[in-house]
Amino acid sequence: MIKREMLGRYRGSMMGLLWSFLNPLLMLAVYTLVFSVMFKQKWQGGSESRSEFALLVFAGLLVFNIFSECVQRAPTLIAANANYVKKVIFPLEILPWVTLGSVLLHAMASLSIWLVFHLLFIGLPPLTALLLPFALMPLVLFSMGVSWLLAAVGVYLRDISQVVGAFTTALLFVSAVFYPINALPEAYRPLLLLNPLALIIEQVRGVLFWGVPIKPLDWAAGMVLACAVAWLGFRCFQRMRKGFADVL
């Protein structure tokens, strides 16, 4: 199903799966132009390098896009696969996993672009980059929990997809994607850390770019929260799925 999802995404386009690599490449070029050239932005605590700023922003976007793609597609997920709803033996709960699998494969393509540019302009990433899968584990569980919840609610409230789109756009600017957390006044930093994505993005930048290992306590706290969200989302999905066939 993940393969079908991947192929279906670019069905009819001339370059097909090549867009998995071209999209992040174009995105990296655009953000480099806008923030580093036009607005002359520099990363606080970093060097004056434009390529460094672009790579740091791109790493944050990589994390954010995993979450945003999952949750934006979740509200219409069941309706788009209505043929599976009346199949008693089909496990509907795997549909968000299929979306996540497709999104993660695209994220791997984006990561490969990031790695190539890092090698060209900065050099080898630090050894802590090997910790990236661990840094992303809370993100995966958190995304799944929210996706299960939105997939179930989206069957009954079709307008929720419009709300989610606006919410994720706003969330982009309060998730430390375009700036480090320590760039904010100290009074506002605790508020930003209430957003789980902000901490995950900082951890990913730390292991990929700065050579900073994940703090065990921060990671454990993130995992506990992510597991709680995943459990809650799954429970809501299982309770609400009983009425899917009647609504669809």
For each feature predicted by the language model, list its residue ranges.
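Hydrophobic transmembrane alpha-helices and immediately adjacent juxtamembrane helices
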Residues: 1-248
